[in-house]
Amino acid sequence: MGSYLNPGNEAFAVALNSEIYVDKTGLLTYTNKVMNTLQGYICNSRPRRFGKSITANMLTAYYSKGCSSKEMFSGLEISRAKDFEKHLNQYDVLHWDIQWCMEPAGGPERIVSYISEKTISELKEYYPHILPEGIRSLPEALSRINAASGTKFIVIIDEWDVLIRDEAADLKTQEEYINFLRAMFKGTEPTKYIQLAYLTGILPVKKEKTQSALNNFKDYSMLHAGPIAPYVGFTETEVQKLCEVYGQKFEEVKRWYDGYQIGKYHVYNPNAVVNLMLEGEFQSYWSGTASYEAIVPLINMDFDGLKSAVIEMLSGDHVPVDVTSFQNDTVSFANKDDVLTYLIHLGYLAYDRTFRTAFIPNEEIRQELILATKRKKWNELIVFQKESEQLLKDTIQMNGNAVAKEIEKIHRKYTSVIQYNNENSLSSVLSIAYLSSMQYYFKPIREFPAGRGFADFVFIPKPEFQNYYPALVVELKWDKSVRAALDQIRDRKYPESVACYAGELLLVGINYNKKTKEHECRIEKIKR
């Protein structure tokens, strides 16, 4: 058992010994299926604290010849597979954590030589008569061993992208590292000695121009995870079971930590869910996982529409995004779509693959983004929030004229000329205008099923604020009148479906005159 060749199973044992362990060994069924095939080159990227290292340690514990793990995996999902014992501890495994290797290597520029030297040294102990003295190329060493003995290797690289993310300015180090990976995995010779390759990190494989630097790898990411989607985070079923055990309300857990849509799965942040179950408090557990310094410089980049897109998403809207141009690094940003795509990979945004839109997935992330912008003084958002807070105050005080003026101002500022006279744009403007309401209200519900129809917007106060803030039913009209809007709310009995959510209920009618581009607003109160 070595440090890098055939490690033991101690690291995975720590995960199994923890109070909460959610069984993800079903992934091994897939890796067993694709090993020694063209599909056996996997890059699985996901955000921090989404279980990347636990997965890498699980693969090592299952495949490595350096340990005996039958008892460890008994009772877990993989133990019920027909080929469970066929692959159990049967392979020579190379496992490197690039982040950890940085310190003993003496710096990023020494990573490739350090990994090569240490791994070759361990290979010589296992295969003493095959490797000649002075050999320095790890790919060559693996090739020689395969030629002499027929041995094939499973290679697992944790934090594979740390040099791409953290050493973006050091092009020489990056180039050396990418060339090392190419030599390890790409071409005819590596197919002879690679049984399975599994890379995990935050970013998918680096692109060069539009082509992946390792185009034989299959990228599974927060954009698309294919067959391994249920193993990216906690699934809804897994979270429901934890809620039953720990007595948590599932709907509240869903509001705080759900939102990542990967294939047919709703995926939850494992770190947040585990901390909630153990500590019992709904809050953001994200702060320790990423730096505020990384967020605001990204959204402050001078790209058309970037800042307004972020404000739209903070208000609950989805924004279109083209994820195809991102180069999978932290420097080659060409437009707002590249920035949004990077934020998706970081976990600050989620991606709707069907409609090709980005959005803020849940309450935890919304709070983190707002907190980050406050700490780093993103002035545009700070000013906008103050305006939004005044709008909410005017709404609650039933000052219809002030509300109309503020919505008109935002309508002009955040809607393009082409979209200005468009009912959908007015709906988006309303979401943006009431951004500050997110402190006290759930995300506004569009087309809320109520009475004999669907209310345009409903704002329901969070439980802790229901005695202080009224529920809001908002109806939008186009070239009609505010009276028509309020009459529709009453005639279709919308209030009856909403009144139970708060002590008071405000009916808000808003009309937009397409010809004059003026807005009107009237507000009425209903007491329960």
Q: Can you say where each PLM-predicted feature lies in the sequence?
A:
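Phosphate-binding site recognition
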Residues: 1-422, 437-441, 445
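Structural motif
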Residues: 154, 470-474, 506
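Mg2+/Mn2+-dependent nuclease catalytic core
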Residues: 174-180, 478-495
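Metal-dependent nuclease catalytic cores in nucleic-acid-processing enzymes
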Residues: 184-191, 341-349, 431-436, 488-508
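Extended hydrophobic-aromatic, low-complexity segments
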Residues: 352, 441-446, 465-471, 482-485, ...
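Conserved catalytic cores of phosphodiester-cleaving nucleases, focusing on short active-site segments
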Residues: 430, 455-461, 469-480, 492
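Catalytic centers of nucleases
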Residues: 444-464
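Domain-level recognition of nuclease-like catalytic cores that cleave nucleotide substrates
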Residues: 497, 501-528
